[in-house]
A protein has these predicted regions:
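Glycine-rich phosphate/ribose-binding loops and adjacent secondary-structure elements
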Residues: 28, 40, 44-48, 53-172
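Alpha-helical initiation/capping and key positions within long helical/coiled-coil segments
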Residues: 22, 26-29, 70, 204, ...
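C-terminal extensions of enzymes
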Residues: 11-17, 175-250
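Generic secondary-structure signature for well-ordered alpha-helical cores
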Residues: 35, 39-42, 106-109, 194, ...
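Alpha-helical packing segments of well-folded alpha/beta enzyme cores
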Residues: 26, 30-33, 37, 74, ...
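Non-catalytic, usually N-terminal nucleic-acid engagement modules in DNA/RNA processing proteins
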Residues: 1-51, 163-166
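Glycine- and acidic
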Residues: 15-20, 24, 84-89, 198-201
Length: 250
């Protein structure tokens, strides 16, 4: 009804430390829902085609928590169905990306896109996901963190509400080309947050979203010219310094 270009089949998410029996039942339910969604999706696309409308893409969602056998089974089950792409759900921590994503991506068809659901709360997630085979991401973190004054810069994350920015008339990030950085200063954004003005959250969100998009653009360029690992090392070393997240190596 809303005309989404991509939508996900229903899936059941389990807690990472749930009992294996619970995880198995949730995975089986996810698979049953996936097949039902695929049938209805094909019916709806036939209607779209008859009306000359754009077709929608449906992704199956791989589950299985932290269990390699279940993850590979789920990826194989869904990979045998004619989905347009695949989502990977239930990855809670960056430290899980290397294992879970690699298990799944080794099993899924190579010619279909892979989407990592709900992970991207920090730049390292993007690099890890791409390194292990992810094509696209979604995450609320850039805007949620922006609403709380946490802003991304290429030299690390800052809290724009801190007193040290009250008289800082530089942009949030001198290298950023977003509307916020081109038109406003750290001092002004600091004032907006201290005054509890909604415009502060809006301008902060614009900046964080642009930072993420620029980072992904740069990752794509590095893949095309064969410099991904060099770019990853230089970017993360500058952003995190000696405080690398768990599971991240340079």
């Amino acid at each position: 009804a809303i005309g989404a270009d991509i939508h996900m089949a229903f899936d059941e998410l389990t807690a990472p430390l749930a009992a294996r029996g619970t995880i198995v039942k949730a995975m089986q339910r996810t698979h049953a829902w996936a097949e039902r969604c695929l049938v209805r999706h094909d019916e709806l696309n036939a209607e779209h085609l008859a009306r000359g409308e754009n077709l929608q893409a449906l992704y199956g969602v791989v589950q299985g928590a932290r269990d390699e056998t279940l993850r590979r089974h789920s990826a194989n089950f869904l990979g045998e169905r004619n989905f347009d792409g695949y989502g990977i759900g239930g990855v809670f921590q960056p430290g899980e990306i290397a294992d879970v994503v690699s298990w799944v991506c080794e099993t899924l068809p190579e010619d279909k896109p892979r989407h990592l659901l709900g992970l991207g709360s920090q730049p390292a997630d993007l690099f890890l996901g791409v390194e292990y085979g992810i094509d696209t991401f979604d995450c609320v973190a850039p805007t949620r963190q922006a609403r709380n004054g946490a802003l991304y810069t290429f030299d690390g994350r800052i809290n724009i509400s801190n007193a040290r920015f009250c008289e800082d008339f530089a942009p949030i990030d001198a290298e950023c080309d977003c509307y916020t950085c081109q038109h406003h200063t750290r001092a002004y954004i600091n004032h907006l947050f201290r005054a509890d003005e909604i415009l502060g959250a809006t301008l902060a969100s614009i900046h964080n979203e642009r930072f993420v998009v620029r980072t992904v653009d740069q990752i794509r360029a590095s893949l095309l010219d064969g410099t991904f690992f060099d770019f990853k090392q230089s970017f993360l070393a500058r952003y995190y310094g000696d405080d690398l997240p768990i599971g991240v190596t340079l």
